[in-house]
Amino acid sequence: MSEAESESRAGREEVWIEKYRPQTLDDVMGHENIVGRLKSYVSRNDLSHMLFSGPAGTGKTTCATAIARELYGDDWREHFLELNASDERGIDVVRDRIKNFARTSFGGVEYRIIFLDEADALTSDAQSALRRTMEQFSNNVRFILSCNYSSQIIDPIQSRCAVFRFSPLADDAVAEEIRTIAAEEDIELTEDGLDALVYAADGDMRKAINGLQAASVSGDTVDESAVYAITSTARPEEIRTMVQSALDGDFTASRATLDRLLTEEGIAGGDIIDQLHRSIWEFDIDDDAAVRVLERIGETDYRITRGANERVQLEAMLASLAQGE
């Protein structure tokens, strides 16, 4: 194996989401307003407690680590503690780690940062306990809480935090980053491969980068087929065909497409529901039909999340659409 091949292989084995994670706030893509506010905090060295809310892969963890890097320089890891609030060992273990970190000498810095991920996974009682912990150490610790849904964070915590709402990244921002990484890793990325990565990611940069790395393992060319296979994502036209067949009254054809997606392509029922919801306004249907499809999607999603059989519920949804219900 040549030296160049060895370097390329080593690069493929490294996790790209960490390798290409932005190091400073200026490097963060797609959130200019949020970055501007955060830079203002950092420039004054006057952080408040913060709540980062938004979907996965939109830059919440990246912004937290970038803040620490800019405040503490090369020693940032000594003054930054990252925890997962849904740690299976419970909030008591999390609180113990917070206390130990907060009580440790911190070499001249005014405060340290604790980044608490998945804070919305905590029960209301656990969040109340967390609020008391935040108050106890507010003099020398700043908390950055991360969640998918701010509505699941109790008001007493929200009122103590500056809230930043991260939206899914724009397709252009995701595409730009994917092109950059592909060039850096010497990956031949086709245009349809890029489009597929952007579609599969749906604003989630982490998913796009992971998809690129996984698809590149099978060869140096990443095209549409490789992306859809590795990300377990249905092609948009397959979703469109499945729904249109049902709306046209052809349940058999619609069910055949569903069966292929579930069985041959191994796509989860929940993911099919998500893609249906994303794609509904791309279908050539009137508003009344769109409303009917959305109602069926909502009912099916609810039943699946409650534990019902995915295939049965999806087939029932298609049958309902085929009957004009």
UniProtKB/Swiss-Prot annotation:
It comes from the Archaea. Gene3D superfamilies: 1.10.8.60, 1.20.272.10, P-loop containing nucleotide triphosphate hydrolases. GO terms for biological process: DNA repair; DNA-templated DNA replication. GO terms for molecular function: ATP binding; ATP hydrolysis activity; DNA binding; DNA clamp loader activity. ATP binds at G54, P55, A56, G57, T58, G59, K60, T61. SMART domains: AAA. The keyword Secreted does not apply. InterPro entries: AAA+_ATPase, ATPase_AAA_core, DNA_pol3_clamp-load_cplx_C, DNA_Rep/Repair_Clamp_Loader, P-loop_NTPase, Rep_factor-C_ssu_arc, Rep_factorC_C, RFC_lid. HAMAP family: RfcS. Part of the RFC clamp loader complex which loads the PCNA sliding clamp onto DNA. This is Replication factor C small subunit. It comes from Haloarcula marismortui (strain ATCC 43049 / DSM 3752 / JCM 8966 / VKM B-1809) (Halobacterium marismortui). The lineage of its organism: Archaea, Methanobacteriati, Methanobacteriota, Stenosarchaea group, Halobacteria. The gene is rfcS.
